[in-house]
């Protein structure tokens, strides 16, 4: 894979970093991330991943944007109220980086659809707001040897964990919450 002149210019600040360089940037451009939830965590994560040059970004969220979301879901604006979060976020991300692939899923993540949705992504970012979905994503990533980055915020507290199930065969995720 060769960089275009535009890509070299766009990603130059990352390429000059020793821990990223040309090889690392090529890996980013070939990678894919599914973001579950386009809310307070998912929306800024999506912005940064698009700017970083992740080659393919998917977002799944069934919710519509409400005015109460605007104080913390920074990808959305007043004009977006009542629109679907996933598809609206993708529209905004295309403006940030039109050269990468995007896919929106305007639905709830369930046991029935998780494999079809998540199978074509290297890494799953869990920004969901409920334990049922978190456990579903964890179980899927464990069974399919996917990398999971899980985060949650409650009032003024938050956490983020990375589980590399491509290397480990056990999950400590449920132990954190039971």
Task: Outline where the language-model segments fall.
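Adenine nucleotide-associated cytosolic modules
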Residues: 1-178
